[in-house]
């Protein structure tokens, strides 16, 4: 893999999920990689072990003699010392998605897009290809248990990429096959309204070449609305009977989901995946559809999906000893994702009391979707809401916005037992009291609530009878 005369790549914010994946791919492809991040983490440590030079904090000195600087949408480029230093030296400065698009030119790209399900679907396709004897190159915005990381550099012709719609990043990619797994309003700091988001997804779909194909989940109304605007070959999937590839007879038992797949109205196979919930049926159908397009045998597709071990932070069971409580860590941060996670917990563990622990992510998202979060959480037996994880936003810019908006919305939606607990220590103590047999604690959010989930699992292990 070559990028002209580029040998050294500097990555600003190298510890982020998407940026660390690029760093891994570049390292495994023989490039020299340097980078910076504000704090040390397990991710930055792993990159250092692989040969990356990682600096803590941002400084003009960090860029050294690199050939290009790559930064993510989470970095305020106009305020970053490293970006400014590179521009002053005449070093090219590009966003993550542009680098991804360049790396894709060497492979047949399978790009997985959608408001929800991108990470899991990308990992399912990768696992399926590996099981079929292919050797794909893979980049996922999360940690795959099967890949033991977020990337894989293979020798085969396929490159499987998670395509992010935030900041219109996916429009820089060069897919041969494109998946649109879901679509609804999200990223209000990028898209003014749903029409702007629709336009971006149509543009993404139409980037596929004439010989490629776009796979659309028709269970989503917004996906159905944009299909007539696509001018590429299409393939539909879903639980809707009109789909080319349809799932029926869905059973959810604990962490396992089983369903029958019909292809063009004919029964094709019975499928089992180690991922609970109807939303994961959509993810698996997307993988099956791409597998059929690539000419993989049905038996190979089914066995490949059966070997899928799951994703970190995607309904990840951190503790589940028989006779004890169940602790689940989930990345859900959009109302539909929260609703799907709660439904999966209800369906898979019908005898358990479901305690939904939710940390809102971003003030802008909390403001836009507070009522929707309330409805999504209302199906839980008990709701505990933490304060907002600010991430790239500043608290001062959003006066009066807190997790209490979500807690109040949950009460209005009919939830019976709701608590807003902004203090972390108090939240941890409260949740430890719920770690008893018969309870399932579902910790959700894109922020540091994952640390709380791990602490609760440790608490359960230490207090085993």
UniProtKB/Swiss-Prot annotation:
<keyword id="KW-0547">Nucleotide-binding</keyword>
<keyword id="KW-0132">Cell division</keyword>
<feature type="binding site">
    <location>
        <begin position="114"/>
        <end position="120"/>
    </location>
    <ligand>
        <name>ATP</name>
    </ligand>
</feature>
<dbReference type="GO" id="GO:0009252">
    <property type="term" value="P:peptidoglycan biosynthetic process"/>
</dbReference>
<dbReference type="GO" id="GO:0071555">
    <property type="term" value="P:cell wall organization"/>
</dbReference>
<dbReference type="InterPro" id="IPR013221">
    <property type="entry name" value="Mur_ligase_cen"/>
</dbReference>
<dbReference type="Pfam" id="PF02875">
    <property type="entry name" value="Mur_ligase_C"/>
</dbReference>
<comment type="pathway">
    <text>Cell wall biogenesis; peptidoglycan biosynthesis.</text>
</comment>
<keyword id="KW-0573">Peptidoglycan synthesis</keyword>
<comment type="function">
    <text>Cell wall formation.</text>
</comment>
<keyword id="KW-0133">Cell shape</keyword>
<dbReference type="GO" id="GO:0005737">
    <property type="term" value="C:cytoplasm"/>
</dbReference>
<dbReference type="Pfam" id="PF01225">
    <property type="entry name" value="Mur_ligase"/>
</dbReference>
<keyword id="KW-0963">Cytoplasm</keyword>
<comment type="similarity">
    <text>Belongs to the MurCDEF family.</text>
</comment>
<keyword id="KW-0436">Ligase</keyword>
<dbReference type="InterPro" id="IPR050061">
    <property type="entry name" value="MurCDEF_pg_biosynth"/>
</dbReference>
<keyword id="KW-0067">ATP-binding</keyword>
<dbReference type="GO" id="GO:0051301">
    <property type="term" value="P:cell division"/>
</dbReference>
<dbReference type="InterPro" id="IPR000713">
    <property type="entry name" value="Mur_ligase_N"/>
</dbReference>
<dbReference type="InterPro" id="IPR036565">
    <property type="entry name" value="Mur-like_cat_sf"/>
</dbReference>
<protein>
    <recommendedName>
        <fullName>UDP-N-acetylmuramate--L-alanine ligase</fullName>
        <ecNumber>6.3.2.8</ecNumber>
    </recommendedName>
</protein>
<dbReference type="Pfam" id="PF08245">
    <property type="entry name" value="Mur_ligase_M"/>
</dbReference>
<dbReference type="InterPro" id="IPR005758">
    <property type="entry name" value="UDP-N-AcMur_Ala_ligase_MurC"/>
</dbReference>
<keyword id="KW-0961">Cell wall biogenesis/degradation</keyword>
<dbReference type="GO" id="GO:0005524">
    <property type="term" value="F:ATP binding"/>
</dbReference>
<dbReference type="InterPro" id="IPR004101">
    <property type="entry name" value="Mur_ligase_C"/>
</dbReference>
<dbReference type="GO" id="GO:0008763">
    <property type="term" value="F:UDP-N-acetylmuramate-L-alanine ligase activity"/>
</dbReference>
<dbReference type="GO" id="GO:0008360">
    <property type="term" value="P:regulation of cell shape"/>
</dbReference>
<keyword id="KW-0131">Cell cycle</keyword>
<dbReference type="InterPro" id="IPR036615">
    <property type="entry name" value="Mur_ligase_C_dom_sf"/>
</dbReference>
């Amino acid at each position: 893999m070559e990028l002209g005369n580029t040998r050294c790549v500097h990555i600003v914010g190298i510890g982020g999920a998407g940026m660390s994946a690029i760093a891994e791919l570049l390292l495994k492809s023989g490039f020299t990689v340097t980078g910076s991040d504000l704090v040390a983490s397990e991710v930055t440590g792993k990159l250092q072990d692989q040969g990356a030079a990682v600096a803590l904090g941002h400084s003009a000195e960090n860029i050294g003699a690199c050939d290009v600087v790559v930064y993510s949408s989470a970095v305020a480029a106009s305020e970053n010392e490293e970006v400014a230093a590179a521009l002053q030296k005449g070093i090219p400065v590009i966003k993550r998605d542009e680098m991804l698009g360049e790396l894709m030119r060497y492979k047949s790209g399978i790009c997985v897009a959608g408001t929800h399900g991108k990470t899991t679907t990308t990992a399912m396709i990768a696992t399926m290809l590996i099981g079929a004897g292919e050797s794909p190159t893979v980049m996922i915005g999360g940690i795959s248990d099967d890949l033991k990381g977020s990337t894989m550099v293979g020798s085969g012709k396929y490159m499987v990429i998670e395509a992010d719609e935030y900041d219109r990043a996916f429009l820089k990619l060069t897919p041969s096959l494109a998946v649109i797994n879901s679509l609804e309003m999200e990223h209000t700091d990028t898209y003014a309204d749903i029409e702007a988001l629709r336009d971006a997804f149509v543009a993404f779909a139409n980037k596929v070449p004439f010989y490629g194909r776009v796979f659309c989940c028709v269970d989503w109304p917004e996906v159905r609305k944009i299909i007539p605007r696509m001018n590429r070959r299409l393939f539909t999937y879903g639980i809707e009977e009109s789909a080319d590839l349809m799932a029926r007879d869905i059973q959810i038992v604990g962490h396992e989901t089983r369903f029958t797949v019909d292809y063009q109205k004919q029964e094709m196979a019975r499928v089992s995946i180690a991922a609970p919930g109807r939303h994961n049926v959509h993810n698996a159908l997307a993988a099956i559809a791409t597998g059929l397009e690539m000419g993989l045998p049905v038996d190979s597709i089914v066995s490949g999906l059966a070997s899928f071990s799951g994703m970190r932070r995607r309904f990840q069971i951190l503790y589940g000893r028989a006779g004890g409580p169940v602790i689940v860590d989930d990345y859900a941060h959009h109302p539909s994702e929260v609703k799907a996670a709660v439904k999966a917990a209800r369906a898979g563990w019908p005898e358990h009391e479901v305690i939904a622990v939710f940390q809102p992510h971003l003030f802008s998202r909390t403001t836009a979707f507070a009522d929707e979060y309330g409805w999504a959480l209302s199906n839980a037996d008990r709701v505990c809401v933490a304060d907002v994880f600010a991430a790239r936003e500043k608290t001062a810019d959003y006066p009066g916005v807190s997790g209490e908006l979500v807690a109040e919305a949950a009460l209005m939606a009919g939830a019976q037992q709701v608590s807003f607990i902004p203090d972390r220590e108090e939240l941890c103590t409260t949740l430890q009291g719920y770690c008893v047999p018969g309870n399932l604690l579902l910790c959700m959010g894109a922020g540091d609530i994952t640390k709380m989930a791990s602490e609760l699992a440790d608490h359960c292990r230490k207090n085993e009878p």
